[in-house]
């Protein structure tokens, strides 16, 4: 075993249930055994767990509920305590303490809360405690609608300063086509950069209990790799998969980390869920992507959502493609008023100004 490393393991609902309606406790026991073995060898382990909704449904006897957000939140509220109790019981067999962290998008959108979450997570690791992380499903409406503990695990990996992120799923990895419908599909073993062609071949999970698919796993891999974290998508059912990944043995699809990872502040910008979005014209698109320029108000065509100065927003071209994320220097109302105008007109329009740019290039990450 090499020197101590930090590994974030994301366990999807399909892995925890084996594709059934209830938690597969025997399989979870085996996953905990693998994690405990690495922990005993001096490695730092972080668990990002799905399954709260599935656990709640099982505990309540599979009630027939309307397909609403409130129903999912009800199940999550019941299931979260059952889920964390299970993790605690299983890790205690090996004398390992766990610490629960429930996060929401707001914890990532706000820089101060992001740093507080980072400090808490690293304090747990420094004291040999295994953090068990989940999205706060009972209150995080946006997470359940869009859903994805995949992206949450990438953010957890950034918070933890992880060396590797392992996304365990019900598939062997990323294939050249959907292996369920195309027998010619081949496993892609190594990925050195995520592009539109790769996104186009990503299929969705068939599990009806979870909320993520292969598309969200690609998003998570993109975020983690750009932060300097190797990411692996592999089958949770593969014997010894967690130990194999830590030992560098080939398993599933490996997304290789960028050689020059983003600095800490830009990791936050890249990982934070956008509070809104703006659409920019062709000139602004070229300036941002080709010359690394700041975004001026003149290039803004439209503003979507309500957000405050200092929040992370998405920047899109007129075809609707994401080109960057950045910290806005003006709130959404102000941007709507100065959109399409020259920077010299900002003070006359608003009665104040925070500088000539809408998003500075130092506060921007291109996609």
Swiss-Prot record:
The molecular function terms of the Gene Ontology recorded here are:
ATP binding; glutamate 5-kinase activity; RNA binding
The signal peptide, as residue positions, is none
Locations listed in the record: Cytoplasm
**One record GO biological process:** L-proline biosynthetic process
Known PROSITE patterns for this protein?
GLUTAMATE_5_KINASE, PUA
Annotated catalysed reactions? L-glutamate + ATP = L-glutamyl 5-phosphate + ADP
Q: What class of enzyme is it?
A: transferase
Its pathway is: Amino-acid biosynthesis; L-proline biosynthesis; L-glutamate 5-semialdehyde from L-glutamate: step 1/2
Q: Which SMART domains match?
A: PUA
- A Pfam family matched in the record: AA_kinase
InterPro entries to which the protein is assigned, alphabetical:
AceGlu_kinase-like_sf (IPR036393), Asp/Glu/Uridylate_kinase (IPR001048), G5K_ProB (IPR041739), Glu/AcGlu_kinase (IPR001057), Glu_5kinase (IPR011529), Glu_5kinase/COase_Synthase (IPR005715), Glutamate_5-kinase_CS (IPR019797), PUA (IPR002478)
Q: Where is the PUA domain?
A: 275-353
Annotated S-S bridges:
none
Gene Ontology annotations for the cellular component aspect, listed alphabetically: cytosol
- Domain of life of the organism encoding this protein: Bacteria
Q: Tell me the residue numbers annotated for binding ATP.
A: 10, 169-170, 211-217
Keywords of the record, alphabetical order, are: Amino-acid biosynthesis, ATP-binding, Cytoplasm, Kinase, Nucleotide-binding, Proline biosynthesis, Transferase
Q: Which HAMAP family does the protein's record reference?
A: ProB (MF_00456)
Function per UniProt: Catalyzes the transfer of a phosphate group to glutamate to form L-glutamate 5-phosphate.
Family as reported in the entry's similarity comment: Belongs to the glutamate 5-kinase family.
The protein here is known as: Glutamate 5-kinase
Q: Which organism is it from?
A: Citrobacter koseri (strain ATCC BAA-895 / CDC 4225-83 / SGSC4696)
The coding gene here is proB
């Amino acid at each position: 075993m090499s020197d101590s490393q930090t590994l974030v393991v994301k366990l999807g609902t399909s892995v925890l249930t084996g594709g059934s309606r209830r938690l597969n406790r025997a399989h979870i026991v085996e996953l905990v055994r693998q994690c405990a073995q690495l922990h005993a060898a001096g490695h730092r382990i972080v668990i990002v767990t799905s399954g709260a909704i599935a656990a709640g449904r099982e505990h309540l006897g599979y009630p027939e509920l309307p397909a609403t957000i409130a129903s999912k939140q009800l199940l999550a509220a019941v299931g979260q305590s059952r889920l964390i109790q299970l993790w605690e019981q299983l890790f205690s067999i090996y004398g390992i303490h766990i610490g629960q962290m429930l996060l929401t998008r707001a914890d990532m959108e706000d820089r101060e809360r992001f740093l507080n979450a980072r400090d808490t997570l690293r304090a747990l690791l420094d004291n040999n405690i295994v953090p068990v992380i989940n999205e706060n499903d009972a209150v995080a409406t946006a997470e359940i609608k869009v859903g994805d503990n995949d992206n949450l695990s990438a953010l957890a990996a950034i918070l933890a300063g992880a060396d590797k992120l392992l996304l365990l799923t019900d598939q062997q990895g990323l294939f050249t086509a959907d292996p369920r419908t195309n027998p010619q599909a081949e496993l892609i073993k190594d990925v050195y950069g995520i592009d539109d062609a790769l996104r186009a071949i990503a299929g969705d999970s068939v599990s009806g209990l979870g909320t993520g698919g292969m598309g969200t796993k690609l998003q998570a891999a993109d975020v983690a790799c750009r932060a300097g974290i190797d990411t692996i998508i592999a089958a949770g059912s593969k014997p010894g998969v967690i130990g194999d990944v830590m030992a560098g043995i080939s398993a599933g699809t490996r997304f290789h980390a960028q050689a020059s990872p983003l600095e800490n502040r830009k990791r936050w910008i890249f990982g934070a869920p956008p509070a809104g979005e703006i659409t920019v014209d062709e000139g602004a698109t070229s300036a941002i992507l080709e010359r690394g320029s700041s975004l001026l108000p003149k290039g803004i065509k439209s503003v979507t959502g309500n957000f405050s100065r200092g929040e992370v927003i998405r920047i899109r071209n007129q075809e609707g493609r994401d080109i960057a994320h950045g910290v806005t220097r003006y709130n959404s109302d102000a941007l709507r008023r100065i959109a399409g105008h020259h920077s010299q007109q900002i003070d006359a329009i608003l009665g104040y100004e925070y500088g000539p740019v809408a998003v500075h290039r130092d506060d921007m990450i291109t996609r």
